[in-house]
A protein has these predicted regions:
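Flexible glycine-/small-residue-rich
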Residues: 58-60, 159-163, 174-176, 247-251, ...
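Gram-negative/organellar outer-membrane beta-barrel architecture
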Residues: 181-182, 301-528, 619-620, 626, ...
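Bacterial Sec-dependent N-terminal signal peptides
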Residues: 1-50, 131, 590, 751-755
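Interaction-mediating elements
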Residues: 39-314, 321-323, 333, 425-426, ...
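Strand-connecting loop/turn motifs
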Residues: 137, 222, 345, 376-378, ...
């Protein structure tokens, strides 16, 4: 008996796959709903209720009631993405027997039910009332309403504000004429004070004015002044919300029974340096003076004291600083003793590492020497030698199959601004450092040999009060020399006359890049910004015309028979973090970049070109897989040369939620692409055009997992293509409407901060 095997129709196989996907998706959502709906009533005692939700509202429109949420002592159980009560559902899956490992694990991962507590609710009402009174609402009241449904309770706190108290008139009662002059009460700049007529009468404003006066006096020689010497007297008429305020400075007493006197003003008599080590002080006297803001003969200043601490903290030769003041008996003079403890001047480190490049195994080793006090001025010299070796497989037609790289780098950092055209007073106030660096890199590959010589001089400085840091590259010089290229590599990649090979060939020619640049970073926890701009070749172009430099066959000016690059490039990166609660936040991100070659260059150097896709870009695509524009690589393969551009746009919105322990989840939508500024034959659809670029913006969506170890984050992202500009058919262009896991899914792993 023979058995005939029937073929299965293609439409039937596709239908089965579609049904299977829907079954898997349905199973996932059913599991999610099961965890969300898991009953926690077995952990809720009789006559008690689960605190399901807390709401805070005001009886006055425009008042930000949500800002007072920190005063609510009980919060409901956290929810994933502010929607799914998974932590409570996980805890509810556990049994009562805590000796079992599975129950302990479920309870550790989940969250114990929050039971409504009337005692904590009453304390919350009192705290809210005090907070409102401190904000000027002296007659404020708070009531609590509870809504019960089954074993669940919703708590609603309503704020009844009343009329706020406002400052009608401010009078300063200060007898000491010296302090009056310092506070400049009779001058226009006094308007910067926190207490102004018509402003709301708040504890915060009183504290601001107290701190302002205290800072001014501490910076003006009043060494023993503190905030407790400032008292406020407020007076208001009955049934009136206007406050007449008196700011009074109490007199000074040397001790409790001493008579009252004017506050003494102290001056610095002498400044000395000492060291806790037997070897003494390792810094030159000029460096000590340069970093000391405290000067003999000047009034004591808390600002100068802090500046001196900050200056010595920047010196890597110094481990810690301790500054002491000693009063001279029966005088208002101070002796200052600055005690320094030094770091070890020399360090030597050795680091081996293994490498794996696309399956090719290799090894590398680096040796680093650091001197933290080279010229006894806390100059830091860092010298690093590195060697790497890798066995390359899969190359045909080449005599050698090994990759070798050797690198030597030297950096010399000065903890001050090296600028002879600036005054010494300005340099002393500056927190900038200067850095001089040199490096030489040697690469020997089967395809080519490359040598790169680099030199740079730059400034760096910080402004902690503004959460900002800056970098200025006065000169950054790179010389790329190609001593040898194999005939096989030339024949296969460089000899073709197409534009693709023009881009590739440009990166395997001798090249000189001399650039200048400026960059800034800002981050205050809610807003983060990175901006950079650089220009290259302009100075050389000026010399080329004046000194009549030679031109090569392509019409480019050359220096030592090497063409130099000329371009301008700017980048802007901005992130906004919106925090909803301790477990949920929203991150908005945009990244813009534009680079334009001109003058002596028709093409950007390859390392200055933009690419799209990857863990820090549009996460539905792999690195360098997207763009430019609607361009698609040959046969859908990644083209590392052609899939680059002169401008980029990346946008992202990411909702982040804490899961358990150090695990965090994320749901994201990304959008962006890259474009070229010129039309290239080998990059059809890649040029930026104002009337159609928005049609070429790629969109992706997905989920991510974060493992937060405080110092670094492990990121796992699963992205799916939603809109693919490389295709015109509706099925492939709008991939979100016709998802195909094999075609659209991309996995990313990265280490670092999200962005």
């Amino acid at each position: 008996m023979s058995i005939q095997q029937r073929s299965v129709p293609l439409w039937f196989s596709s239908l089965n796959r579609c049904i299977l996907r829907k079954v898997k998706l349905s199973f996932f959502f059913l599991t999610l709903l099961f965890l969300v709906g898991c009953s926690s009533s077995k952990f809720i005692p009789e006559n008690e209720y689960l605190l399901q939700e807390v709401e805070i509202k005001s009886d006055q429109k425009g008042f930000d009631a949500a800002s007072l949420e920190p005063y609510i002592r009980q919060k409901a159980n956290s929810k994933w993405f502010s929607l799914f009560n998974i932590p409570l559902g996980t805890y509810s899956l556990s049994g009562r027997d805590t000796t079992k490992w599975v129950n302990r694990t479920l309870r550790k991962i989940g969250e114990e039910p929050v039971l409504f507590d009337t005692v904590q609710a009453n304390q919350s009402m009192n705290d809210l009332k005090k907070a409102l009174q401190n904000a000027g609402y002296m007659h404020a009241d708070v009531d609590l309403q509870t809504k019960i449904k089954g074993k669940k309770l919703k708590a609603i706190y309503t704020l009844h504000l009343g009329e706020p108290y406002r400052i009608n008139r401010v009078r300063y009662d200060i007898a000491d004429e010296r302090i009056k002059r310092i506070l400049a009460l009779d001058k226009p700049q006094h308007a910067i004070r926190s207490l102004q007529s018509g402003s709301r009468f708040t504890v915060e404003r009183l504290d601001e004015e107290r701190n302002r006066i205290t800072k001014l006096l501490l910076d003006s020689g009043f060494y023993k002044f503190h905030k407790d010497f400032i008292v406020f007297e407020a007076d208001s008429a009955r049934n009136n919300t206007d406050i007449n305020l008196v700011v009074r400075l109490l007199k000074y007493r040397a001790y409790s029974d001493a008579p009252e006197t004017n506050h003494p003003r102290y001056f610095i008599r002498d400044v000395k340096f000492s060291s806790s080590e037997e070897s003494g002080i390792h810094l030159r006297p000029k460096i000590l003076e340069y970093n000391t803001a405290i000067k003999a003969g000047e009034p004591f200043s808390a600002a100068h004291l802090q500046a001196t601490y900050n200056n010595f903290a920047r010196l890597q030769a110094v481990r810690y600083t301790n500054i002491k003041f000693k009063e001279l008996p029966d005088t208002t003079l101070l002796d200052c003793d600055i005690q320094l403890s030094h770091n070890k001047p020399h360090t030597l480190s050795f680091q081996p590492e293994g490498t794996n490049t696309a399956g090719d195994l290799g090894a590398a080793v680096s040796l680093t020497y650091e001197n933290r006090n080279l010229f006894r001025g806390s100059e830091v010299l860092r010298v690093q030698l590195r060697g790497a070796f890798e066995a390359i497989t899969g190359l045909e037609g080449y005599n050698d199959q090994d990759y070798q790289e050797y690198n030597a780098e030297a950096k010399l950092q000065f903890p001050r601004l090296l600028a002879p055209f600036l005054s010494s007073a300005f340099q002393r106030r500056s927190t900038a450092s200067s850095e001089l660096s040199f490096s030489y890199n040697l690469q020997n590959r089967p395809e080519f040999h490359r040598r790169v010589l680099s030199a740079a001089f730059r400034y760096r400085w910080n402004e902690p009060k503004r959460y900002s840091s800056y970098r200025m590259d006065l000169i950054d010089l790179n010389y790329v020399y190609m001593p040898w290229i194999s005939d096989t590599f030339k024949r296969d990649y460089l000899d073709d006359v197409s534009s693709r090979n023009a881009i590739l060939r440009y990166n395997y020619e001798n090249l000189l890049v001399m650039k200048m640049g400026f960059g800034l970073r800002f981050n205050n926890g809610r807003h983060a910004m990175i901006a950079n701009i650089e220009t290259a070749g302009n100075i050389l172009k000026g010399f080329s015309k004046v000194l009549s430099f030679r031109k090569n066959a392509q019409g480019q000016y050359t220096l030592f028979n090497t063409a130099y690059a000329q371009y301008v490039k700017g980048d802007f990166d901005y992130t906004r973090l919106i925090t909803f609660d301790t477990h949920n936040s929203l991150a908005l991100h945009i990244d813009l970049g534009l680079a334009y070659p001109y003058g002596n260059s028709k093409i950007l150097p390859f390392e200055k070109r933009y690419f799209s896709g990857g863990a820090n870009s549009v996460r539905g695509w792999s690195v360098r897989e997207l763009g430019p524009g609607s361009f698609r690589g040959t046969d859908g393969r990644i083209d590392f040369i052609n899939q680059t551009g002169d401008m980029k746009l990346d946008m992202s919105i990411e909702y982040r939620t804490k899961l358990f322990w150090k695990f965090h989840g994320a749901a994201f939508v990304d959008a962006g692409n890259i474009w070229t500024l010129r039309q290239y034959e080998e990059q059809p659809g890649g040029q930026f055009k104002l009337h159609e670029f928005y049609k070429q913006i790629a969109v992706a969506y997905g989920l991510g997992l974060r493992l937060n170890f405080d110092f670094f984050i492990l990121r796992f992202d699963m992205g799916m293509k939603a809109i693919n500009p490389a295709y015109e058919t509706q099925r492939e262009h709008f991939a979100v409407l016709h998802p195909n896991f094999g075609r659209d899914f991309t996995f990313h792993f990265a280490v670092g901060m999200p962005f």
